[in-house]
Every structure is written in C-alpha cells, then in structure tokens.
C-alpha cells in the first residue's frame, strides 16, 4: 500500500491532489482473516518512509534542507509499485512522469528516470515557457515488471497532448539494468 493523503482545492481551482506535508510511506499490510485473527480489518505489519538522504533527486523537494529529506505528496504523485527480485522497489509516478528506484528501507537509490520527451505541467523538468507534452495527472498510473526483473512496463494514464487518438494508453519498456527506455512501446 502506498499511502498519501489527498485533498482537493475549492471548486474551479487547479487541483494538485497531494498534500505537501504528508510523508510518503510504503506499507506492508494483511487482511486480518488471512492472519487468522478475525475478518474485516487491515493490519499494517511494517512501513517505511520514502526519503532521499543521499540527494539522488536532482530538483528541490519539500524537505530539501533536512538530513533525511523525507518525500511528500508535493514531490511525487506515486501511483504504482513493482517489487524487484533483489528486494528493492520500482515506483511509477505522475508528476514527471518518473520511475523511482528505492531500497526496501525507503531510501531513493538513483535519480528519478524521466520518460524522454514527455513532461506534465507539474514536472520539475518543465522549463519556463515550455509547453507540457502530457496533460496533468496523466503520468505513470500502472506498471508491471518482467518475471526476471530486467524490464519494467509503466503505462501512461492518458494520451500525449498531441496524440490524435486521446483514448490511446501507451505501455513503455524500461531496462532496469541500464535505467533507460528501450524504445519499445505497445
């Protein structure tokens, strides 16, 4: 479970649904009936906070000036998670859109991996005056991985702004060894 609190601004205002002071956490949870302790509840067994103490994220974050550099909903909009065979996690998010690589303790291992040529209005990589190529909140929504962990397949929630078919949802292939997109899409 990826936890992030969501808020919405007043009707008609721009909506950025991630709260700036809400730390992002990964939680390992189980249903109580699966644990043999009764039905109808979810029990959190373990959780870790996502953080960047090594400074891998190359742009300013909400807690830029703290030692732990906890990540919040203002930094990334996490939507998908793939557990890698080595115990690390790959996370798809919407703002960049980016794929993040984090250790099992929540520490960011590498710089966020941007999809080349694609930027949302919320992307920290969007230069002043640059036109976004992806509508807001249409970044990586779903993601899966190959059984051996070599490739990830993040899926854009929406079509690129210039795509004539706005129903199109593109699956991209990311090589986890090189941390580069292969150019293969579906």
Language-model-derived ranges and their functions:
Residues 1-186:
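Sequence/structural signature of beta-propeller domains
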């Amino acid at each position: 479970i990826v936890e992030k609190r969501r808020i919405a601004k007043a009707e008609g205002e721009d909506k950025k649904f991630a709260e700036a002071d809400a730390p992002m956490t990964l939680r390992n949870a189980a249903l109580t009936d699966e644990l043999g302790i009764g039905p109808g509840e979810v029990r959190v067994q373990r959780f870790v906070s996502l953080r960047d103490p090594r400074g891998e994220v190359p742009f300013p974050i909400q807690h830029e000036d703290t030692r732990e550099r906890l990540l919040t909903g203002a930094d990334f909009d996490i939507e998908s998670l793939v557990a890698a065979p080595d115990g690390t996690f790959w996370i798809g998010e919407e703002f960049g859109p980016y794929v993040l690589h984090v250790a099992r303790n929540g520490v960011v291992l590498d710089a966020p991996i941007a999809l080349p040529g694609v930027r949302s209005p919320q992307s920290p990589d969007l230069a002043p005056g640059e036109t976004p190529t992806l509508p807001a909140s249409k970044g990586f929504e779903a993601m899966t991985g190959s059984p051996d962990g070599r490739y990830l397949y993040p899926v854009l929630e929406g079509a690129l702004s210039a795509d004539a078919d706005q129903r199109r949802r593109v699956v991209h292939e990311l090589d986890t060894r090189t941390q580069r997109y292969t150019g293969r899409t579906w």
